[in-house]
């Protein structure tokens, strides 16, 4: 999972690599259409026409689809949950809070967050390996407040699903050397449950190619650390051009693997933390 600072990003931004900025008029037009659609949904909801409401949402999927390339550009083309490009299949614009119906842990259904169907702050990029299994799954902690259109309180809900636009949620994730996504050491029981349920529902460990790719990244970084330490030892007694060149080579490769745009950069960073090589850790501080 990679943190996306969605709150402070707009399609009009001109500093997003690989993205051609929208004009302010384009963005204003998109927001205006969103507002119109939500007003129409509200009228259908008030009239008790839930099926028509949901049909209107489905009929306008192209509206959130218009933001897909911008959302992908924010992560360098990576899925926000798996942090890979092709291994997690093609990408969907996923609604963090389900738009039509929401399911609890036991499968019980409640009405969805239809008023957020066209709210870009509810959009995430997810490969369909995970998105198809997630569906409307959105359980809340027992006793949590539950937002409704008449009593909105999304900020006070306690969802199981980890959110890539919440830096605190992203910080709950760690990895092991076998490529498995695990809870961060020292996490509370509730935090561990959130990680476990998110991993299970989005197939973040079950999808074998993804776990194998993580293991490969871990092994690459682990080998680079060994090379770095061996070269550093050779330099300890004085000048050694070959060893010095090796240090520079390793540093360059570590920078590449831990760069935000790299696939599974969070795995590479965590491996460095686990191995606790101070000089290499400085490269990603």
Predicted segment positions?
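A boundary/linker detector
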Residues: 1-65, 87, 281-285
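C-terminal, charged low-complexity interaction regions
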Residues: 5, 183-285
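Short, charged surface segments at domain edges that flank catalytic/cofactor-binding sites
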Residues: 32-78, 102-117, 121, 144
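A general structural signal for short secondary-structure junctions and capping/turn motifs
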Residues: 69-72, 83, 115-118, 152-153, ...
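Generic beta-strand structural signal
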Residues: 77, 114, 121-125, 158, ...
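Histidine-centered nuclease catalytic patch
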Residues: 84-129, 133-150
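Acidic, metal/cofactor-coordinating or nucleic-acid-engaging core segments within structured domains
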Residues: 132-137, 141, 167-168, 202-216
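Long, low-complexity, intrinsically disordered segments enriched in glycines and aromatic residues
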Residues: 141-188
């Amino acid at each position: 999972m990679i943190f996306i600072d969605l709150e402070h990003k707009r399609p009009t931004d001109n500093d997003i690599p690989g993205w051609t900025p929208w004009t302010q008029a384009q963005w204003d037009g998109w927001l205006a259409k969103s507002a119109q659609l939500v007003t129409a949904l509200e009228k259908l909801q008030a009239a008790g026409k839930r099926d028509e409401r949901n049909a209107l949402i489905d009929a306008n999927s192209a509206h959130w689809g218009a933001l897909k390339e911008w959302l992908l550009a924010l992560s360098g083309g990576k899925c926000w949950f798996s942090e890979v490009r092709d291994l997690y299949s093609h990408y969907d614009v996923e609604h963090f809070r389900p738009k039509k119906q929401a399911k609890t842990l036991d499968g019980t259904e409640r009405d969805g967050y239809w008023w957020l169907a066209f709210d870009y702050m509810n959009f995430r990029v997810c490969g369909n390996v995970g998105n198809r299994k997630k569906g409307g799954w959105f359980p809340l902690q027992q006793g949590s407040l539950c937002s409704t259109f008449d009593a909105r309180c999304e900020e006070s809900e306690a969802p199981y699903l980890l959110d890539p636009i919440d830096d605190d949620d992203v910080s709950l994730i760690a990895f092991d050397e076998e490529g498995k996504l695990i809870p961060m050491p020292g996490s509370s029981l509730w935090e561990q449950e959130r990680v476990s349920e998110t991993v299970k529902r989005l197939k973040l460990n079950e999808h074998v190619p993804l776990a194998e790719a993580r293991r490969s990244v871990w092994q690459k970084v682990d080998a680079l650390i060994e090379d770095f330490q061996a070269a550093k030892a050779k330099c300890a007694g004085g000048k050694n051009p070959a060893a010095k060149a090796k240090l520079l080579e390793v540093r360059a490769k570590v920078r590449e693997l831990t760069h935000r745009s790299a696939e599974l950069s969070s795995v590479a960073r965590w491996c460095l933390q686990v191995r606790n090589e101070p000089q290499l850790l400085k490269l990603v501080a």
